[in-house]
Amino acid sequence: MKFIQLYGDRGLTIVKGEGQYVWDISGTKYLDLHTGIGVAFLGHRNRRVIEYLSRQMENIMTLSTSFSTPIRDEMLKELDPLKPDKMDNIILLNSGTEAVEAALKTARKITGRKKIIAFKNSFHGRTAGSLSVTWNKRYREPFEPLMSPVQFLTYNNIDELKNIDEQTAAVIVEPIQGESGVIPANEDFMKALREQTQKVGALLVVDEVQTGFGRTGKVWAYQHYGIIPDLLTAGKAIGGGFPVSALFLPDWIAEKLEEGDHGSTYGGNPMAMAAVTAASKVLKEDNVVEQASIKGEIFKKILREKLSDLKSVREIRGKGLMIGIEIRFPPAIALKVMQDERVLALKAGSTVIRFLAPYMITQSDMEEASNAARKGIIETENKRAIT
């Protein structure tokens, strides 16, 4: 049996994780700023998550949501103070793309309209509906025709928002475009977007699969912009390392959904509910959101101090512990050098080194990562100069 590698192979066999670190099969320790593309924001093998999962495993592991469970009730109680504004309802799923699919379906049903608007350089997933609102043609074109009609507007361009009209069911937006280069939305753009969707009766869907649950220094990244969306997708960090996603909805939308409108065999399973319960406790008890905000500013400051003299560094940007270093060249060489220096990061867009650090990252870790990034970028510059 052969494993089909659909992601780039990093050439490492990882056998253990703890907090902000992972170890390979030879025992080499790495600082993990990749975190499974942002999943391990609460750290690898978080003790409270393990405790809740272990306890639940002794009782029951899987069950249809047709049946109630005490752990789901506990999860709802613990998550309640963290829920997005005015969203008292949740659909429980497994992966980010599932949450996006549910959001698109919900928007079409609620509005009775078909047209969806997304943004250039967006990424929302690889299943058929989510792929339809993902910009990268390399992902989309082999599988077309997909869901339609879908129109892509320019991110952060207020003038183009006039294309959101009375035929639009929903607009889906990332508050920070992660896959495309850690590009934050402008506040005036987000406010104009909210105003235009309300004006024409379209739903505003904020995709927070990567940005949500504390990573950007707010529980939800939309809170940086002074708006409230109609629907919000969450995933990655919300399960503390366990596969969970969710669609959050306000009452006025939830009350219009009927049995059979959506479903998920594993969604809301007891193990997932245990993971979200624990993750919610960690977020509150460890002041994770505040830590992400403070540490993110420290990290960006250190990066700027270490990298400001390098001519190929264009910009260091992001919010909280979602940080991008834009350089003049593709980051493959730099990422390999960083890996050799025992720091794991990942690519974003065509020229960005992306850091998705766990909240327990220390200043010493930040120094180590910044030094590794410097070495990697210098190596990139040298090789580019030669070739």
UniProtKB/Swiss-Prot annotation:
Q: Catalysed reaction per UniProt?
A: [amino-group carrier protein]-C-terminal-gamma-(L-lysyl)-L-glutamate + 2-oxoglutarate = [amino-group carrier protein]-C-terminal-N-(1-carboxy-5-oxopentan-1-yl)-L-glutamine + L-glutamate; [amino-group carrier protein]-C-terminal-gamma-(L-ornithyl)-L-glutamate + 2-oxoglutarate = [amino-group carrier protein]-C-terminal-gamma-(L-glutamyl-5-semialdehyde)-L-glutamate + L-glutamate
Cofactor(s) listed in the protein's UniProt record = pyridoxal 5'-phosphate
Q: Which residues bind substrate?
A: R126, S264
Q: Keyword Transferase: yes or no? A: yes
Any one cellular-component term (Gene Ontology): cytoplasm
Q: Which UniProt keywords apply?
A: Amino-acid biosynthesis, Aminotransferase, Arginine biosynthesis, Cytoplasm, Lysine biosynthesis, Pyridoxal phosphate, Transferase
**CDD domains assigned to the protein according to its UniProt record, in alphabetical order:** OAT_like
| SUPFAM superfamilies xrefs | PLP-dependent transferases
PROSITE patterns with a match to the protein in the record: AA_TRANSFER_CLASS_3
Concerning its family, UniProt says: Belongs to the class-III pyridoxal-phosphate-dependent aminotransferase family. LysJ subfamily.
> What is the protein name for this chain?
[LysW]-aminoadipate semialdehyde/glutamate semialdehyde transaminase
